[in-house]
A protein has these predicted regions:
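Charged, amphipathic alpha-helical segments
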Residues: 1, 59-86
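Short, compositionally biased strand/turn segments
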Residues: 1-16, 87-101
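Solvent-exposed edge beta-strands and adjacent loop segments
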Residues: 2-68, 114-133
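Residues within well-ordered beta-strands of beta-sheet-rich folds
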Residues: 61-63, 99, 137-139
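Short, acidic/charged, Gly/Pro-enriched secondary-structure junctions
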Residues: 73-114
């Protein structure tokens, strides 16, 4: 379930190298951590035996406004570039840190996730009175 954030909530995306992007955040759909179980059952065992093995930190999806500025298309392009950077015959991936700052909070980066951009939805443009929105999905690698 998405959490609707108060007006003025800022999402800052900071790449491992380069400049950060600041976006007005609308909502965040949080991550669900899960643990895969390894089967350690021997052939002679009559009951399955399993142990926790690897932790999957999950994904975080956040929805933001497409700003009505000259840099709006640059923001989408930068996010796409961060998703997968192709240089010649090699593909590089950019780790990003998502930090959420709530209005009125004296704590910077109250919520922070680190990971890789795994999906970007394009804004739906049509005849409506709503602001343009798009969402970004981050595969979390560290919390």
């Amino acid at each position: 379930m998405a959490v609707v954030l108060p007006l003025g909530t800022i999402a800052t995306l900071t790449p491992a190298t380069g400049s950060a992007i600041v976006l007005n955040c609308i909502s965040i759909t949080g991550t669900t951590r899960s643990v895969a179980m390894a089967d350690i059952t021997a052939l002679s065992d009559y009951m399955l035996k399993k142990l926790p093995s690897r932790v999957d930190p999950g994904t975080v999806t956040f929805e933001v406004y497409l700003e009505d500025t000259a840099t709006a298309t640059n923001t989408l392009k930068t996010l796409r570039d961060w998703q997968a950077t192709v240089t010649g015959s090699s593909i590089g991936y950019n780790s990003v840190t998502l930090s959420i700052n709530f209005p009125g909070s004296t704590i910077d980066a109250l919520i922070s996730y680190q990971g890789y951009i795994s999906g970007i939805t394009e804004p739906t443009v049509g005849a409506s009175d709503e602001a343009l929105r798009f969402s970004v999905t981050l595969q979390v690698t560290a919390v």
